[in-house]
């Protein structure tokens, strides 16, 4: 039976202008953080709005604790650099991020044995076992800490506990955003707005065309008290018994990737990118509530089972369940160019490429709404088909898009043009000069971050 919709009307109200800036970034996840840094580094005043009490989005609040999709197996190079590598290196310096050294990349048995349970392998390859590659496992609170340090370092005005409500738009041009806070409704005015919400909240509110998308939801969790050495030894020495138990765990979870648990930099703590739940909408309050309730039931049933059956997990306990639901796909921008699965599969290079993912390139046009000016979009809600987005939604390419969007916003203001008319050649040049790889050149990135060469990266964690 269909529910009858009811509506109310509210009188027009005056809204306090809480702040003004050159650029407002809505959403403090990976793309939003990178966008704010990219803009501020290039000399404009930036306000960063975030709904939670921390930065990081799905990286920290969602506890997606593996940074992958930044290694080009065809060219054997690190393909996402810039702000992403800065963040990784700073977390590693704290002993709270680990990744394989350059001499460990590949399918050497010792490397596979050491790194597979960290998730540091190229899961896109068709060969088994998947080769070890450059990928980083990290701690969520390390991300929060380093993100705050970077925001303060670049003079970004941070406004936490600010929920986006509505886009301010006049004559097709975005003028700022309306937020809800504990102090009431507030207006934040800006010359350029960057939508880094993950769900296209700002662009959709402004009337930009989009397509609805849907993919599985996940309530990620961490377990403590795990003897990972014993667990790996059982997996290695009793493969048949392990396979039977592993199959039952996945049945109880209701959905997971091949490896349902992975190591973290914290001793005895593993993270579990599961349970996966299908058929739910990531912007529906009812569906999100269902996911939280259903997910926790799967988690607690799984813990009860592995305590009694799985070597290494006898004394495990739930450390935490991610405070942010793992949403992979909702609204997708239909921008000046729409990325396709074919673009990704064929590794199409574009003249206006401004970011790279694993082995694919992203043109500037995928950040541009069709009908709205002074607005850029960066993150998993970029302009792509549903299938293409599923292949390109990981954190590193989202950070690369964000960095490009931030630099583009600054460049537009400094040259007196709209973001739609930014000189992309100049944008590419700035990105490359500041350590990013916009994908404008086909040459390899031969240099490796200093910490990737170090012998003690893993041992410091």
Predicted regions and their residues:
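Conserved beta-strand-loop-beta-strand element in the redox core of flavoprotein oxidoreductases
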Residues: 168-187
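Extreme N-terminal leader/targeting segments of oxidoreductases
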Residues: 1-23
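Flavin (primarily FAD) binding-site architecture
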Residues: 195-208
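Core beta-strand elements of the Rossmann-like FAD/NAD(P) dinucleotide-binding domain
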Residues: 19-21, 183-192
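Short hydrophobic core segments
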Residues: 26, 188-198
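Mobile, glycine/GP-rich and aromatic-enriched active-site lid/loop segments adjacent to catalytic centers
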Residues: 104-137, 141-145, 149, 153, ...
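Conserved N-terminal/central alpha/beta ligand/cofactor-binding core
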Residues: 2-4, 20, 45, 51-166
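N-terminal Rossmann-like FAD-binding beta1-loop-alpha1 element of flavoenzymes
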Residues: 23-46
């Amino acid at each position: 039976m269909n529910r009858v919709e009811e509506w109310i009307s509210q009188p027009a109200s005056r809204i306090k202008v809480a702040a003004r800036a050159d650029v407002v970034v809505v959403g403090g996840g990976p793309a939003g953080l990178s966008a704010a840094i990219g803009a501020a580094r290039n000399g404009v005043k930036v306000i960063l709005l975030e709904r939670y009490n921390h930065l990081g989005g799905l990286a920290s609040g969602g506890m997606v604790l593996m940074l992958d999709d930044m290694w080009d197996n065809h060219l054997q190079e690190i393909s996402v650099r810039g702000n992403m590598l800065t963040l990784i290196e700073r977390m590693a310096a704290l002993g709270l991020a680990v990744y394989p050294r350059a001499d460990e990349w590949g399918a050497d048995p010792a490397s596979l044995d050491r790194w597979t349970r960290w998730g540091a392998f190229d899961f896109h390859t068709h060969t088994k076992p998947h080769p070890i590659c450059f990928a980083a496992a990290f701690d969520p609170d390390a991300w929060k800490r380093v993100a705050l340090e970077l925001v303060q370092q670049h003079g970004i005005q941070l406004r936490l506990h600010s929920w986006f409500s509505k886009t301010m738009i006049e004559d097709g041009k975005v003028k700022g955003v309306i937020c809800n806070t504990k102090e009431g409704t507030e207006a934040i005015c800006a010359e350029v707005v960057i939508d880094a919400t993950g769900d296209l909240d700002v662009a959709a509110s402004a009337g930009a065309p989009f397509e609805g998308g849907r993919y599985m939801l996940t309530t990620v969790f961490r377990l403590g008290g795990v003897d990972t050495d014993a667990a790996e030894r059982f997996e290695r020495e009793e493969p048949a018994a392990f396979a039977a138990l592993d199959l039952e765990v996945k049945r109880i979870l209701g959905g997971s990737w091949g490896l349902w648990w992975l190591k973290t930099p914290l001793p005895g703590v593993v993270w579990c990118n599961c349970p996966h739940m299908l058929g739910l909408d990531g912007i529906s309050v009812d569906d999100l509530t269902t996911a939280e309730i259903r997910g926790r039931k799967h988690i607690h049933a799984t813990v009860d089972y592995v305590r009694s059956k799985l070597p290494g997990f006898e004394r495990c306990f739930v450390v935490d369940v991610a405070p942010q639901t793992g949403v992979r796909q909702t609204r997708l921008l239909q921008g000046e160019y729409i990325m396709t699965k074919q673009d990704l599969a064929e590794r199409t290079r574009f003249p206006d490429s401004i970011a790279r993912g694993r082995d694919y390139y992203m043109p500037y046009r995928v950040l541009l709404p069709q009908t709205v000016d002074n607005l850029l979009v960066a993150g998993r809600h970029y302009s792509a088909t549903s299938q293409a987005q599923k292949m390109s939604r990981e954190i590193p390419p989202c950070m690369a898009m964000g960095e490009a969007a931030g630099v583009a916003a600054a460049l537009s203001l400094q040259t007196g043009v709209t973001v739609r008319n930014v000189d992309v050649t100049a944008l590419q040049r700035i990105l490359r000069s500041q350590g990013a790889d916009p994908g404008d050149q086909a040459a390899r990135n031969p240099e490796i971050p200093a910490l990737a060469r170090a012998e003690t990266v893993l041992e410091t964690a």
